[in-house]
Amino acid sequence: SLTLANEAVSVPAAYRLYLPEAWAKDRKRRAAVGVPKTVKFQTKWQIALDMIDSVRAEGLPGAPVLADAGYGVVTAFRDALTERQMPYVVGISRETTVWPPGLEPLPPKRSSGKGRPPSRIRRSSKRKPAPVLELAKHAPASMWQHISWREGTRGTMTSRFFWLRVRPAHRDENRHEPREVEWLIAEWLRGESVPTKFWLSTMPPDTPIEQLIRLAKLRWRIERDYEELKGSFGLDHYEGRGWRGFHHHGSLCIAAYAFL
């Protein structure tokens, strides 16, 4: 689903049922529940891009895209947002690799004079990217700061954060040049032995860290929307097995939620 949100209000703007590949290829099951012939298998991040494009085509203004790590770890998803000139703040896994400041891939090998000249950047055993967990875990204590981002039901929401400008490194050995520099943000929750939450962001380099963290944390509104849609508006009460019926049910739940 796609939700439009700010710090004061949020509402789902688009949603689509994810169809597993096994279902997408099974004609009998598709026919039994009325899946349209035009619906093909798409990964969740591809569906997300389609919904973003659809909402933008309706004339809604562009805004930073927020997504959890299920989407943020997909380099193709992040690249597609950049191609659309849409800045993002997306969750990533602790294993995501980046080039820290002052460290970049090696240039292409020198040409031997035979065949096509090498054009891909390189890594070596001594020059390679680092997982974001290792980078954050070994950062000096002075680089971690307590920052507050909103008032919650139990008081001010505050945690310890680390941020740095880095280059994402995923499969860049297949590229001709390094990726652009963007933000890495890490959060070290109280009581945890290591940092546990990480984000990448293409917001401008002069973006205040407080704004970056507010955006990263804005997903709480989306989670709250789902809790209310399920608990108070019956989104998860649909008992049918029809494609159209499910989407009609979901549309009515969301319309009622937006109205109230």
Describe the residue ranges of each PLM region:
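Short, conserved catalytic/metal-binding motifs centered on acidic residues
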Residues: S1-L2, P64-Y71, Y88, W199, ...
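An anionic, glycine-rich sequence signature occurring as long contiguous blocks
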Residues: A5-F41, V89-S93, V98-R221
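Short, basic/hydrophobic alpha-helical segments
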Residues: V39-A63
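Short, surface-exposed basic-aromatic patches at helix termini and helix-loop junctions that form
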Residues: A57, A76-P87
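Acidic, metal-coordinating catalytic cores used for nucleic-acid/nucleotide bond scission
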Residues: A67-V74, R94-T96
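A short acidic (Asp/Glu
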Residues: V73-D79, V98-L103
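Short, solvent-exposed helix-loop connector elements
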Residues: A76, S201, I209-A216, G231-H248
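Short, hydrophobic/amphipathic alpha-helical patches that form generic packing surfaces
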Residues: G250-L260
